[in-house]
Regions:
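Bacterial Sec-dependent N-terminal signal peptides
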Residues: 1-30
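Domain-level detector for secreted/extracellular nuclease and nuclease-toxin modules, and
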Residues: 23-261
């Protein structure tokens, strides 16, 4: 396969960064807890471990069911620009599930990051990995570029304030037969998206969750607030089950946006 010069340059840069710097955390270091952060019955799919995040990819929908990562204050301070990085098929997946960038062409939907590029500016490898199409869902442009982006920015502020936050997000499918897009690979269009945010600062643990419809309307963050318990009922997942019960029960019942501000 012929690769563009830009692609080759990025690979060379990536190799250099990995070889010469210790800033990129290994998968084992980064994801010691993330692989078990979501419990419950999983659909037919594949667990994917990337630099910076872990996800579970749904083979039938060709979107992630969930994506989880820890965002630290140091990582928020990363300065790597997203310019020059391209959406790529994930070769860890079976060929039939390797969504291509052109599958979104003309669909009217944005390629919406679940783990956002703005959270992965701390290394070339983490930025590269977040552009795999296994980390992407079809999002209405107004949601992706406005309400959802505002929430992503808020999460970065919270990580800076509290030292680190754990984030889990993913699509919600309410219809039995969702809309599909894709020229070669069929990609299911979500009805909405959830995001769970938790700070585990000792003695000050707190949590909050959000749900946004995949629509063009402006959706204020305050109106999108949910408890983690509500999102668990919606997704049928159990988040943070390895926490002590008293802490888990307390943070999963919280819905005070002001506690994070």
């Amino acid at each position: 396969m012929v690769r563009s010069l830009g692609f080759v340059n990025r690979v060379l840069c990536l190799t250099l960064v990995i070889a010469t710097f210790g800033a990129t955390r290994s998968i084992a270091q980064q994801h010691h807890d993330l692989k078990t952060i979501v419990k419950g019955k999983m659909n037919k799919g594949q667990l994917l471990e990337k630099t910076g995040y872990v996800s579970f990819f749904n083979f039938a929908r060709n979107t992630p069911d969930w994506v989880a990562w820890e965002l630290t204050a140091a990582e928020v301070g990363g300065s790597l620009a997203r310019k020059g990085f391209e959406f790529l098929p994930d070769e860890q997946l079976p060929k039939a599930n390797q969504v291509m960038a052109y599958d979104y062409k003309g669909s009217g939907y944005d390629r919406g990051h679940m783990c956002p590029a703005g959270d992965m500016k701390w290394s070339v490898k983490s930025m590269y990995d977040c552009f795999y199409l296994s980390n992407i869902c079809p999002q209405v442009p107004e949601l992706n570029q406005r309400s959802w982006e505002r929430l992503e920015s808020a999460c970065r502020r919270w990580a800076s304030k509290w030292g680190s936050v754990y984030i889990i997000c993913g699509p919600i499918y309410k219809k039995k037969s969702p809309e599909y897009i894709g020229t070669e690979h069929r990609i299911a269009v979500p009805d909405g998206f959830f995001k769970v945010v938790v700070s585990l600062e000792k003695g000050k643990e707190k949590g909050i969750a959000f749900y946004y419809d995949n629509i063009a309307d402006n959706q204020p963050m305050q109106k999108a607030v949910r408890t983690i318990d509500e999102i668990e009922k919606l997704t049928k997942y159990d988040f943070f089950s390895e926490l002590p019960d008293d802490i888990e029960n307390r943070i999963e019942a919280q819905h005070d946006l002001n506690s994070f501000r």
